[in-house]
């Protein structure tokens, strides 16, 4: 695990806060987050590519009701981190997609359990109103720490696994993953066609 990958995980954990917990300035969108994170690894073109692919692959997932969409930040972070560790982008991206889906499941669980903490913090603020800033900062720090732990552990495990298996992966598997990776934008665009058709009517 290089310092660049570690810093990437830290930055990703901060960007995840932009989705719901703080600011909401759309920095957590894949098309923005991936190029920003790629500045850490030094491969901006890979960041732009991952950002576009992430936007397209999750284009038809809408955060409505109880649906929590996969995290574009996690997808981008895992993909770029694994690529920085020497894993081909066409392998890294699919680990990123898997990580983003698992992260959304974990986040849904954390949000359910966070309600108890919110009640506790609300009572604390009502008792001591002057502690509101400290309480909010503590809540954000807790969310950041949980995000970092989840992203770091998943990236580390995937990196170890792929670096171990990479010499034994046959060329046919490389070709299949390359083909699947290059099909991602077309699949994403295909999911948008019905949406545009409905808007046009």
Predicted feature locations:
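Small-residue-rich segments of transmembrane alpha-helices in multi-pass membrane proteins
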Residues: 32-41, 76-86, 126-132
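Hydrophobic alpha-helical segments at protein termini of multi-pass membrane proteins
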Residues: 4-11, 76, 82, 113-126
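C-terminal transmembrane helix-loop-helix hairpin of multi-pass membrane proteins
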Residues: 6, 134-201
């Amino acid at each position: 695990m290089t310092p660049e990958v570690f810093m990437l995980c830290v930055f990703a954990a901060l960007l995840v806060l932009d989705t719901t917990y703080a600011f909401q300035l759309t920095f957590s969108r894949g098309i923005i987050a991936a190029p920003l994170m790629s500045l850490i690894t030094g491969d901006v073109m890979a960041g732009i590519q991952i950002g576009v692919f992430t936007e397209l692959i999750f284009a038809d997932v809408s955060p409505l009701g109880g649906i929590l969409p996969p995290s574009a930040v996690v997808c981008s972070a895992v993909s770029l981190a694994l690529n920085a560790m020497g894993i081909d982008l066409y392998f890294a991206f699919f680990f990123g997609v898997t990580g983003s889906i698992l992260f959304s499941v974990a986040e849904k669980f954390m949000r359910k359990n966070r309600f108890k903490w919110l009640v506790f913090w609300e009572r604390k603020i009502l008792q001591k109103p002057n502690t509101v800033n400290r309480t909010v900062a503590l809540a954000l720090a807790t969310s950041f720490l949980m995000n970092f732990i989840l992203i770091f552990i998943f990236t580390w495990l995937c990196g170890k696994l792929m670096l171990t298996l990479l010499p034994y992966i046959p060329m046919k598997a490389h070709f299949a993953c390359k083909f699947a990776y290059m099909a991602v934008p077309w699949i994403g665009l295909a999911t948008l066609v019905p949406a545009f058709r409905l808007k046009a009517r």
